[in-house]
Amino acid sequence: MMALQSTRDPKEFGRVAVLFGGKSAEREVSLKSGAAVLAALQAAGVDAFGIDAGDDLLQRLSSERIDRAFIVLHGRGGEDGSMQGLLECAGIPYTGSGILASALAMDKLRTKQVWQSLGLPTPRHAVLASEVDCQAAAQMLGFPLIVKPAHEGSSIGMAKVGDVAELIAAWRAASAYDAQVLVEQWIQGPEFTVAVLHGEVLPPIGLGTPHTFYDYDAKYLASDTQYRIPCGLDAAREEALKVLSARACEAVGIRGWARVDVMQDAEGNFWLLEVNTVPGMTDHSLVPMAARAAGLDFQQLVLSILDDSLEAGN
């Protein structure tokens, strides 16, 4: 396991391209994350510059001198293995998880299937492709339910539903974002998020919001979202949450850094929702918050993440 705080001379990283923006539905969040990461690297003395990953990305990668890349692209095209594959073909080391883990974590259905195969708890679910599927899912799972695109992040396209009519409407709305739509059991209870850095689990964060769930507005826009560190669990339950989150990351093959989202039901049981391989790095973001609780400021955090690109030998 690597030390959390980098001890390298910033010049060892060479010329670093911070990749952000892109074309996914999470572009605006990525722009903010990328700006924060770029500013922190430059302030630390790293020779870093930004690339908005658009149509000219291939040209930029071939024309610029790039010693390594810091990926801050959220969602499709950056978090799903495609950018990782492109960088590997170009021979450019990069931060975070590799191709397989990135692609798997971006696919909520297959991530759940991996967890289920290992006996890790995740809510019961069904795949929706028609109104008939909606009817069948309602009978199998009951209400309330939550509908989500299978390959989106930041809670984009998600909706809580309480009857079949709402389920059909939510499926249609989610289908605008993804050809594959999931519906899951609604877990009533507190939500937690757990950051993992170089295999070490950072202090879990308890989340509270007056919204129906921790949606896009609660994540990035609202001023009334509550973040609890310590998370509010007793020592034994917090340790169980940390162990489960570490196992969830190990199952997917996470490298470097990630964030796991977890619910707790009324009986105290934990349920894995998803794992994010390129979590947000904005002023509202959770990984920087957890890092601060572990004694790392934002600059130390980004250097630690970048350190992994040297250690991993992508």
Swiss-Prot record:
Its EC number is 6.3.2.4. Pathway: Cell wall biogenesis; peptidoglycan biosynthesis. Residues 112-307 form the ATP-grasp domain. One of its GO terms (biological process) is regulation of cell shape. InterPro entries: ATP-grasp, ATP_grasp_subdomain_1, D-Ala_lig_Van_CS, D_ala_D_ala, Dala_Dala_lig_C, Dala_Dala_lig_N, PreATP-grasp_dom_sf. Its main location: cytoplasm. Mg(2+) 2 binds at residues 274, 276. The keyword Transport does not apply. Its cofactor is Mg(2+); Mn(2+). Keywords: ATP-binding, Cell shape, Cell wall biogenesis/degradation, Cytoplasm, Ligase, Magnesium, Manganese, Metal-binding, Nucleotide-binding, Peptidoglycan synthesis. It is an enzyme of class 6 (ligase). ATP binds at residues 138-193. Pfam families: Dala_Dala_lig_C, Dala_Dala_lig_N. It is found in: Cytoplasm. PANTHER family: D-ALANINE--D-ALANINE LIGASE, D-ALANINE--D-ALANINE LIGASE B. Cell wall formation. This is D-alanine--D-alanine ligase. It comes from Stutzerimonas stutzeri (strain A1501).
